[in-house]
């Protein structure tokens, strides 16, 4: 299950206290959150997605959000748990397809040091 950042205050906290990483199409804000634990005490990560009106009309923005959500969902098992992540879409994302979006997302997650290769048990930096 993918947990979401929903409230404005959650986004603000990540923006202010988190660390940012950027590439051409995305900006990633990351904040370690020790309170992200389920009933069994297992840590999980939360994600928030922000797409500005500068990117395009509502159809384009929704498409971008769907692409980012799906990329995160499919790579969730390879991301270290216990973090709040906010992805902010930049203008060039409107012209990118799923594979380019996923590549940009993985690139930022690796830059942040959150990518964990399950097969090899290796944390990428």
UniProtKB/Swiss-Prot annotation:
Pfam families registered for this protein in UniProt: Ribonuclease_P (PF00825)
GO biological process, one term: tRNA 5'-leader removal
Similarity comment: family membership: Belongs to the RnpA family.
UniProt-listed InterPro entries: Ribosomal_Su5_D2-typ_SF (IPR020568), Ribsml_uS5_D2-typ_fold_subgr (IPR014721), RNase_P (IPR000100)
GO molecular-function terms, A-Z: 3'-tRNA processing endoribonuclease activity; ribonuclease P activity; tRNA binding
Gene name of the record: rnpA
GO cellular component, one term: ribonuclease P complex
Reaction(s) catalysed by this chain's protein: Endonucleolytic cleavage of RNA, removing 5'-extranucleotides from tRNA precursor
Enzymatic class: hydrolase
Tagged with keyword Nuclease: yes
Subunit structure: Consists of a catalytic RNA component (M1 or rnpB) and a protein subunit.
Record organism: Clostridium botulinum (strain Eklund 17B / Type B)
Protein name: Ribonuclease P protein component
């Amino acid at each position: 299950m993918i947990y979401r950042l929903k409230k404005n205050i959650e986004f603000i906290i990540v923006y202010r206290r988190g660390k940012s990483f950027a590439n051409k199409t995305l900006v990633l804000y990351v904040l370690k959150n020790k309170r992200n634990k389920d009933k069994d005490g297992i840590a999980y990560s939360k994600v928030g997605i922000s797409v500005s009106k500068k990117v395009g009309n509502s159809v384009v923005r929704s498409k971008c959000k769907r692409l980012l959500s799906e990329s995160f969902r499919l790579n969730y098992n390879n991301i270290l748990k216990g973090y709040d992540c906010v992805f902010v879409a930049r203008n060039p994302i409107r012209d990118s397809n799923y594979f380019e979006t996923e590549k940009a997302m993985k690139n930022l997650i690796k830059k942040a040091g959150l990518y964990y290769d399950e097969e090899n048990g290796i944390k990428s930096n």
